């Protein structure tokens, strides 16, 4: 096993140094190369590229920055720019999509097919959708949707997620659309129940009568349901959060089901934003990042999920289910690899229940390869993958073994909410979404400084200003090709990864409040 792990680590390091086609986030899984693709590879639909332009964009030497040809293709005058990697993989494995979704109440039985009521629009006037409020029950509720997917070990999962995740989101929102329309009434515990309007004196039913189901008891035909036990009050935004979490899970399950019929390679991180009823819901699974820049202030809207940030979750899972380690790994963390000559000595270690460090006596099991190895961007789960949440990766195994890594990976996103109605936003207040290709070389502060320097120098009425701002960020992260590779400010190493950036102006959210 030690030889296999050393080989995996060597392959990874060699890929980084030589710019191999291997992914920074993980190794390749079992491919279905003889199977048809679920969807053909391409760049985001809203870029409006021809096939020739797609091929020209895949120049790993020139690395041309792609931007929107027509700003009306994205709502809110959203800016977008992207660039391919410096040779890490053949294709740009990032994917993006942006749509306006219309959610209508589900009619009839629940089906497993994508929601037909979701209206996909690839070309939208800048002002369209600014008054996104329900007009009637038949029209449902409209919401804006932006997404970024960072693929690894192939673009298959990212392409599929960019085409289908919005359908799962729409489907999950269908059950609650009528509840969301009426913000004055708390969501019922059970769908179909009427809101409680019974006066206080009508709720004095005894516990015995309640259990017998007598007149006035819950479920009796003569009165609305009466609650003997206290119930949690669930706010409306928690329903939306739950819908997004469920949609991510369903998307991951669909990839798992369909990989036997289609070639869906690798996995992907997922970062999405839904603007619904005056609130931004930012859901992230992976190491992409979202920040709001408001009046120069930085407001983080996501967390990154890596072997280091999720160490305790991963260690606890391995502790509870040691068979997942294949008798080849230890769930304990040590400052460095344990050597056989150190058996019987006391060494610093850290377990799932610890944020600090303690000493333990080294045993034979401690000589196994650690579940989490490396630091920072080089940290890996089982020496294989550097991101712990996302979609896909169902066939990913430890190099030259039958140990699956998927049990340690989660599709669950973290969802954060931003209420647009609480602030009056200016033309320079924006939400930045970007894959890790940007954040690997630029800090939140550097991105905020770039935005606050760039936007004030643009005409506030210029519809291209946010696209130009996105282009500026990508250019700052990519840098300039010199004798020693791509270099950015202060002669630092530029990003050799795929980079995708949205710049979403929040001033349009003022009209939704």
UniProtKB/Swiss-Prot annotation:
Modification sites for Phosphothreonine: 113, 223
Job description of the protein: Dephosphorylates CDKN1B at 'Thr-187', thus removing a signal for proteasomal degradation.
Gene: Ppm1h
GO cellular component terms attached to this protein's record: cytoplasm; glutamatergic synapse; mitochondrion; nucleoplasm; nucleus; synapse
Gene Ontology MF terms: [pyruvate dehydrogenase (acetyl-transferring)]-phosphatase activity; identical protein binding; phosphoprotein phosphatase activity
Modified residues (Phosphoserine): 7, 123, 210, 220, 421
Family membership: Belongs to the PP2C family.
Protein name according to UniProt: Protein phosphatase 1H
Region called Disordered, residue ranges: 110-133
Swiss-Prot/TrEMBL keywords: Cytoplasm, Hydrolase, Methylation, Nucleus, Phosphoprotein, Protein phosphatase
Swiss-Prot/TrEMBL catalytic activity: O-phospho-L-seryl-[protein] + H2O = L-seryl-[protein] + phosphate; O-phospho-L-threonyl-[protein] + H2O = L-threonyl-[protein] + phosphate
Annotated source species: Rattus norvegicus (Rat)
Gene3D superfamilies reported in the protein's UniProt record: PPM-type phosphatase domain
Record-linked CDD domains: PP2Cc (cd00143)
Predominant subcellular localization, coarse grouping: nucleus
PROSITE patterns in the record: PPM_2 (PS51746)
InterPro entries: PP2C, PPM-type-like_dom_sf, PPM-type_phosphatase-like_dom
Cell compartments where the protein resides: Nucleus; Cytoplasm
